[in-house]
Amino acid sequence: NAAVHHPGFRHAGPTRREIGVSTLFNVLGPLCNPARPEASAVGVADLARVPLIVGVFQTRGATALVYRGDDGIDKLTTTGHSHIWEVTAGAVQEHDIDPVELGIPRAAIEDIVGDEPERNAEAIRAVLAGERGPHRDVILLNTAAGLAAYELWRRPEERFVPLRERLATQLRRAEGVVDSGLAAARLEAWAAATQRS
């Protein structure tokens, strides 16, 4: 969250929420991470902003998966295809991913769009507690993208393996972590550690 890493962004948060549309802060947040991670998975809703974001990762020499659902959401979607720009070693490869090819059923957009933060948190906790359905599918798919980006940074030769195969591998890995209860336990530990008195 940019507001945590960049205190100046904190003041823009309430206004951004009131506006209710994407702003420059939606672009700056992922790009201004002071940790400068070597691997990133970043969703972009606005297709016109993709070249800018991909270009930043290229210039930094970072490894990244930048993606956009064809339904216009800034996530890998389960409502249809997603477009992915894979940045590694200064080069960009474009991919089209259909979640059905990964064994994920199609969802309706209304089944996966977010809600108020409290409801989103409830949905995530339900998925981590074992609930199946469209929320689980989209969470696992996007988790797989993050894991695939990390593995690509860790082992650059992964770029020679088709992205669909890498996503399928990481999807199984994400399923295992959720189904084992480990993800729920980590969330609870993190929540407890970050409670403010």
Feature locations, PLM:
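Glycine-rich anion-binding loops and their surrounding alpha/beta cores
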Residues: 1-197
